Amino acid sequence: MLCLAVCTMTLAQAQDQLKVITFNIKSFENSNFDVKPFAKLLAEENADIICLNEVENRSARQMDPKTLKYRDVVQDLAANLKLFGVFGYSYNLMNKKGDEDESKYTFCQDELYGNAILSRYPILNINAMQLPRPANSADQRGVVTAEILLPSGKMVRVACTHLDHIGGQMEQAKVLVGSNVLSATIPTILTGDMNQWPGTEVIKLLDASYDRLCQEGKTYQAGSKLDYIYGSKGAFEVVEKRIAANVCDGVTLSDHFPVISVIKFK
């Protein structure tokens, strides 16, 4: 009876604990668009939720050289890791600057660029939306969200975003804070490359709105902390947090490092 109680408690604790990774993968460029090194690196971490930025999906330079067909690299990576995967596009690569009607490019679902979420557990609801694009920003940015059903029966919402690297980050962050992207009714995890370092007004806004759940220290090779994991206020406790290596089999996979947090529900 004691063993059953202990085992049940341990299982319940494990079900309420999540290992989360956020990683800007630089479009798979450094591996010549081969997802396998990324799959190997990420498989070693055995995470429950993986959020990816700078995801180039179904693009011409990712075509299968034998069949010359577009590849859904998000689903390729998800299959390699035996995870569920969703992709939310921010813009079409053929229309990067947004000078024309975006709708004419998106019907084919090819040449897309955005963010992705991979999950060990079933994804029930998905949403993707574009963020504001002020005149001083470089690219159209977006956020993809997924509501995930955990084994314990609890729901968690995961939002993966990538703010602009030139300007407009405050306008984009205000939309994240003010919209229903981060639901007040479902515990939410916000991840991504915010392109802002600690102490900036954008990060002060996010810090005031959510609990920061990630390790301090540089996440970008140039020396800045740009990548973050946040959670709904008071919803999560940090069990472990660190910044991991970005090298697999001697290949530096990105100019960013994976940011890893193990969290549990309070």
Model-predicted regions and their roles:
Residues 2-3, 12-49, 69, 84, ...:
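Active-site regions of metal-assisted phosphoester/phosphodiester hydrolases
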Residues 6:
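Nuclease and nuclease-like effector domains acting on nucleic acids or nucleotide cofactors
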Residues 22-24, 51-60:
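Acidic/histidine-rich, surface-exposed loop or edge segments in extracytoplasmic proteins
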Residues 55-59, 90-96:
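Acidic helix-start/capping segments at beta-turn-to-alpha-helix junctions
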Residues 58-76:
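Membrane-embedded segments
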Residues 87:
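A basic- and aromatic-enriched beta-loop-alpha substructure that forms the phosphate/nucleotide-
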